[in-house]
Amino acid sequence: MSANHMTPGEIVSELDKFIIGQNRAKRAVAVALRNRWRRQQVAEPLRHEIHPKNILMIGPTGVGKTEIARRLAKLANAPFIKIEATKFTEVGYVGRDVDTIIRDLTEYSIKQTRELEMRRVRSHAEDAAEDRILDALVPPPRGASGEPERGEDNSARQTFRKRLREGKIDDLEIEIEIAQPMPQMDVMTPPGMEEMAEQLRGMFAGLARDKKKSKKIKVREAFKLIVEEEAAKRVNEDDLRAAAITNVEQNGIVFLDEIDKIAARQETGGADVSRQGVQRDLLPLVEGTTVNTRYGMVRTDHILFIASGAFHLARPSDLIPELQGRFPIRVELDSLSAEDFVSILSETDASLIKQYTALLGTEDVKLEFTDDGIRRLAELAFSVNERTENIGARRLYTVMEKLLEELSFDASANSGEVITIDAAYVDLQLAETAGSQDLARYVL
């Protein structure tokens, strides 16, 4: 089922597969996504007046703020970009211009739409690729004009077509004309002139377009290259751009991370001028403006903005009032407990335990995690967070990597073995490191 037709409850259930807890944040993003579908059902001109309710997530690092937004975008198959607010500065200062957020989002949408269109025409492209490879192997008869005549396959072509589909001639070398790849050119421009750089790249890429060269390659590689070339021919670039821009305008999601770092704090000066400048530059994007991209004009009125920050040193009220008003939905995310760590390790769809079990399984090493082993691992990770910097669930990555360090290194020597990870094994590998505050600070 498409996420666009899912109820908020169904969206939360999908998010539950990957993120533990944080129900308030999940409910907020689920309602925001459902409201997009509701808006599409409203008749014009009222539809145009309904704007998304942007969300401000407040919570420490590693509790799932980014993951919620990323999974939501994946669920909705929507253009999504995550950017650090600290990378941007007020126009005139050294740093990136905030308009590049929308340009980058549009680039992502173009890529996403192109992949979708290429998949749609792939079967026709594969048929055309087969014919071109067969033309190189068994040239068709030519008519009076000298052009190849297409008709029923003769017995030789039928034989080669059958062998090609069965993969029996994959390693056979053929000489074939293929389009030259576009040159990858990097254009250096001063900050704030990214649009000019994009136009120059497009101009240089256009110089090489439609140029072909003869190349001798294996049938397997030739088939892949020709399928891509034939699929690209069948995609209408103008329609693709129009669809991609519409997708950005109606379904785009921008995740603004570290927004608390550009909040002006009362007791500091100096840099606050630039911080407030970034907020004022962001304001038109969030409330709705038109950004010029190399694919056309993009309106931001209905793009959903999700901002997040820990707000340790600043408060949401330190943001300029106009920007505060553009994020009407505020949700606080909870710090993760040891029980949450147990659930993250054992209950999520793509848990770290499943990932490491699959990785070592490729070398015929079978990992078996016991319940007490998982609990001990979670307790150690939670303990290190309490005594050093609290980096939330990201601590599980460092702890798991340290736990399986020796095993990963010697995996080939342990091929065919079953390794049981219980509490004793976890203590043996990690207790000394986790117990020492200095070691935990630098190793875990």
From Swiss-Prot:
Compartment(s) of residence: Cytoplasm
Any one GO MF annotation of this record: proteasome-activating activity
Single GO cellular component term: HslUV protease complex
Keyword Cell division: no
Pfam families: AAA (PF00004), AAA_2 (PF07724)
Keywords recorded for this protein, A-Z: ATP-binding, Chaperone, Cytoplasm, Nucleotide-binding
GO BP: any one term: proteolysis involved in protein catabolic process
Main localization category: cytoplasm
Superkingdom of source: Bacteria
Residue ranges of the region described as Disordered: 130-158
HAMAP family linked: HslU
PANTHER family: ATP-DEPENDENT CLP PROTEASE ATP-BINDING SUBUNIT CLPX-LIKE, MITOCHONDRIAL-RELATED (PTHR48102), ATP-DEPENDENT PROTEASE ATPASE SUBUNIT HSLU (PTHR48102:SF3)
Protein family according to the UniProt entry: Belongs to the ClpX chaperone family. HslU subfamily.
Protein name per the record: ATP-dependent protease ATPase subunit HslU
Native source species: Bordetella pertussis (strain Tohama I / ATCC BAA-589 / NCTC 13251)
Taxonomic lineage: Bacteria, Pseudomonadati, Pseudomonadota, Betaproteobacteria, Burkholderiales
